[in-house]
Amino acid sequence: MVLPKSMRIKGYKSFDYLHKTGLRYNSSSMLLKVAKANSRLIKSKLSDSKFINSTRCAISISNKVSKRAVVRNQLRRMLHDYLKAKLANIPTNQNLWLLFSLRPSSLNKDPKELLKEMDTLISKARIFND
């Protein structure tokens, strides 16, 4: 399953904001950018402010990872499922935007290794209060 709409980052302005202001955390096959939420960039039909000021995520997988959309979508779905479970543990007072970008080397890795790398990036960024 994919992330709910209230947890997704959408729009090129939001991605530009993340690329310009986000803190960068690297691993061998993944990149994490973390920035404080900017509610002015969200166009939401949901009038409830708890959705506007919540933690949001995006996963970016370029054509360099795989030319086949099926493969990219499988990776994206796997990472979305994992993130959905992890986001339940984020404190509600943290309004963060997370952008995970996969590198071409990620295609050769085992899915368990990718999830482990995602965990290490999240712990480097100190997102959770575990």
From Swiss-Prot:
Organism: Prochlorococcus marinus (strain MIT 9211)
GO biological process: tRNA 5'-leader removal
UniProt superkingdom: Bacteria
Keyword terms: Endonuclease, Hydrolase, Nuclease, RNA-binding, tRNA processing
InterPro entries: Ribosomal_Su5_D2-typ_SF, Ribsml_uS5_D2-typ_fold_subgr, RNase_P
Protein name: Ribonuclease P protein component
Gene name of the encoded protein: rnpA
Record has Hydrolase as a keyword: yes
A single cellular component GO annotation: ribonuclease P complex
GO MF: 3'-tRNA processing endoribonuclease activity; ribonuclease P activity; tRNA binding
Family: Belongs to the RnpA family.
EC number: 3.1.26.5
Quaternary structure note: Consists of a catalytic RNA component (M1 or rnpB) and a protein subunit.
Catalytic activity: Endonucleolytic cleavage of RNA, removing 5'-extranucleotides from tRNA precursor
Enzyme category, top tier: hydrolase
Role of this protein: RNaseP catalyzes the removal of the 5'-leader sequence from pre-tRNA to produce the mature 5'-terminus. It can also cleave other RNA substrates such as 4.5S RNA. The protein component plays an auxiliary but essential role in vivo by binding to the 5'-leader sequence and broadening the substrate specificity of the ribozyme.
UniProt keyword Ribosomal protein present: no
